[in-house]
């Protein structure tokens, strides 16, 4: 709302459209950040790496009603390019979003949003200007565990690629 911001750890998120680029987050209405996002109609998804995993966990178990997470956890704010909501400076990728729709689904409400800007820390880009997951040490949350994603297992289509034959 321009006056307050919070950091909330979100387990339910994902891409829902490529063109236009859209994604979603799902939050319980009881969460402190819920009303902030509902009123401002914007948010930033700050992707988490191994360096931020403990901070992300702490942001998920402590409420912004009780503490200013930015100050207590010494997280540096980075002004976003398009939205008023700040980005996390330490995050390798910050995705700025504007809410298009809110679906009240039950325990969680889904914020469907258009991506309006993406900010990537240049040190994680490869020589082809592609984001390098193996350099960024990205983390996902799965059923109570934080799991590192620094290993490439294959490329698109590798399961059906024909093996080269020697002549």
Give names to the regions the model predicted.
Residues 1-167:
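Basic, polyanion-binding surface patches
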């Amino acid at each position: 709302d321009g006056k307050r911001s919070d950091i909330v750890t979100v387990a339910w998120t994902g891409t829902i459209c490529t063109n236009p680029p859209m994604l979603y987050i799902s939050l319980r209405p009881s969460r402190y950040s819920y009303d902030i996002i509902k009123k401002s109609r914007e948010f930033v998804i700050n992707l988490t790496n191994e360096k931020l995993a403990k901070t992300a966990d702490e942001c998920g178990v402590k409420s912004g009603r009780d503490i200013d997470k930015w100050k207590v956890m010494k997280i540096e704010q980075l002004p976003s390019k398009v939205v008023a909501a700040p980005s996390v400076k330490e995050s390798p990728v910050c995705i700025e979003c504007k809410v298009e729709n809110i679906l009240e689904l039950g325990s969680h409400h889904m914020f469907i949003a258009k991506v309006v800007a993406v900010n990537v820390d240049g040190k994680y880009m490869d020589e082809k200007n592609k984001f390098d997951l193996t350099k960024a040490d990205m983390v996902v949350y799965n059923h109570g565990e934080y799991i590192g994603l620094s290993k490439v297992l294959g490329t698109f289509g590798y399961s059906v690629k024909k093996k080269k034959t020697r002549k």
